[in-house]
């Protein structure tokens, strides 16, 4: 929410991400810089992918009072995988922190915790939630076989895997760093449950190995 700065210098974005950033920051004058560069004198803000800003860049931005725009995939990203270079339909742009980073607050977190919501907006959000569930909309919207709950009354627990080098593990789950450790922790917490393990779609597609 809000107006993006007029002059934004973006660091370390690959060419295909540059194309998307131009769309999402339409109205801002964008200049793309190498990862090890520093903002020029006309910059009003710097943009980086996730938590990849180098310490020197962060220090320079703070010293000059420049806004830091941290960019990441949105929760409803695309029809297809980002690792397969499918263009996104949503990105998150946050000036405070990343939603997956448990070590720092984010604009999204603050907005949800302290914001006030008109009844009409709450009703719209609920209608959208119902529509997403009914139409089985997911982050990547990949085709797949249907799943049926196992027979009986046994508790079923979904265990969602991740690419183990992903920043969400580094900053969001300091006590669990591998998918195997995650499964072991869930089994210890749910000894009688039926566990369903869902590997990350990038791993299933062969675009990343689990530990990459």
Where are these predicted regions, by residue range?
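Catalytic-core helical/loop segments in enzymes performing group transfer/polymerization on anionic/lipid-linked
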Residues: 1-212
């Amino acid at each position: 929410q809000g107006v993006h700065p007029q002059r934004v210098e973006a660091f370390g974005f690959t060419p295909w991400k540059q194309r998307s950033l131009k769309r999402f920051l339409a109205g801002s004058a964008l200049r793309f810089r190498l990862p090890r560069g520093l903002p020029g004198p006309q910059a009003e803000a710097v943009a980086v992918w996730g938590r990849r800003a180098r310490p020197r860049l962060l220090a320079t931005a703070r010293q000059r009072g420049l806004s830091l725009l941290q960019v990441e995939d949105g929760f409803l990203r695309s029809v297809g995988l980002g690792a397969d270079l499918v263009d996104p339909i949503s990105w998150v742009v946050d000036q405070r922190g990343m939603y997956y980073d448990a070590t720092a607050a984010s604009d999204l977190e603050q907005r949800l915790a302290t914001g006030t919501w008109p009844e009409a907006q709450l009703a719209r959000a609920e209608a959208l939630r119902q529509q997403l569930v009914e139409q089985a909309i997911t982050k990547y919207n990949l085709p797949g076989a249907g799943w049926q709950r196992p027979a009986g009354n046994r508790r079923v627990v979904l265990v969602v895997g991740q690419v183990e080098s992903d920043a969400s593990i580094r900053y969001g789950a300091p006590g669990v760093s591998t998918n195997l450790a995650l499964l072991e922790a869930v089994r210890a917490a749910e000894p009688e449950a039926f566990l369903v393990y869902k590997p990350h779609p990038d791993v299933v597609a062969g675009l990343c190995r689990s530990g990459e």
